């Protein structure tokens, strides 16, 4: 935890933290609703989709990495990963140079589901997207949210933000906009590259 150095005004601190708390809660309620609707045709929940997302971006991730970057408890990461394994979307494995940690990778079916979800994304059904439109039309771009990213970096650390930024770069590299829809690029992506040598884990 970063040390807070005085002087600071306690009233200002209260107003700021409550402003962030209440705005974040309101924003999350809208995000959660739209996220759930996006996933509904695939019978996935938000944690499951987040796990697929992280496994794709890291080309295989440990349960502890999923918990860290997915902002969830280790047991939550493991239990939902097992459910995804049962559906054929993930496979569990051990790295030959790291027998302690359990890793998950997307299966071919899991990768197809992940790609399909992105291709089905419709921004017109997203309240955050629609709420940003006045700013987009005024400045010609979406809000950068640099201040929020700075705060998240100081709360969760550089590793968290590096994965976050990498995930956005990967989407930019792996997909293109075609007639208002995302389409997978024909070229090989990072997810197609061979991962470290793994051995399967018996369920």
Swiss-Prot record:
Location of the DNA-binding region in this protein: 63-86
InterPro entries reported for this sequence: HTH_MarR-typ, HTH_tscrpt_reg_Hpr, MarR/SlyA-like, Tscrpt_reg_MarR-type_CS, WH-like_DNA-bd_sf, WH_DNA-bd_sf
Keyword Metal-binding: no
Cysteines paired by S-S bonds: none
Keyword Transcription: yes
Domain HTH marR-type intervals: 13-157
Pfam families referenced in this protein's UniProt entry, alphabetically: MarR
One Gene Ontology term of the molecular function aspect: DNA binding
Annotated stretches, region: Disordered: 183-203
Induction: Negatively regulated by the Mrp homolog protein SalA and by SenS.
Biased composition (Acidic residues): 191-203
Domain of life: Bacteria
GO biological process, one term: regulation of DNA-templated transcription
SMART domains, alphabetized: HTH_MARR
Entry keywords, A to Z: DNA-binding, Repressor, Sporulation, Transcription, Transcription regulation
Quaternary data: Homodimer. Interacts with SinR.
Biological role stated in the UniProt entry: Negative regulator of protease production and sporulation. Acts by binding directly to the promoter of protease genes (aprE and nprE), and by repressing oligopeptide permease operons (appABCDF and oppABCDF), thereby preventing uptake of oligopeptides required for initiation of sporulation. Acts with SinR as a corepressor of epr expression. Binds to non-m6A-5-methylated 5'-GACGAG-3' sites, tested with scpA; when the target is methylated by DnmA, this repressor no longer binds and transcription is up-regulated.
Protein name: DNA-binding transcriptional repressor ScoC
UniProt organism field: Bacillus subtilis (strain 168)
């Amino acid at each position: 935890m970063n040390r807070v150095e005085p002087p600071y005004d306690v009233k200002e601190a209260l107003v700021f933290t409550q402003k962030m708390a209440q705005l974040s809660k309101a924003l999350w309620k809208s995000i959660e609703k739209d996220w759930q609707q996006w996933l509904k045709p695939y019978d996935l929940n938000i944690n499951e989709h987040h796990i697929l997302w992280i496994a794709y971006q890291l080309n295989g991730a440990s349960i502890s990495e999923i918990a860290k970057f997915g902002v969830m408890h280790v047991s939550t990461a493991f239990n939902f990963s097992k459910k995804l394994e049962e559906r054929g979307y993930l496979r569990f494995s051990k790295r030959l140079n790291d027998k302690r940690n359990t890793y998950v990778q997307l299966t071919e079916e899991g990768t197809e589901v992940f790609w399909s979800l992105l291709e089905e994304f419709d921004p017109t059904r997203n309240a955050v997207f629609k709420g940003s439109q006045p700013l987009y039309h005024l400045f010609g771009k979406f809000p950068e949210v640099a201040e929020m990213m700075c705060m998240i970096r100081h709360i969760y650390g550089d590793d968290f933000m590096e994965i976050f930024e990498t995930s956005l770069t990967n989407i930019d590299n792996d997909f293109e906009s075609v007639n208002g829809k995302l389409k997978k690029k024909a070229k090989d992506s990072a997810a197609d590259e061979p991962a470290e040598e793994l051995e399967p884990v018996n369920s």
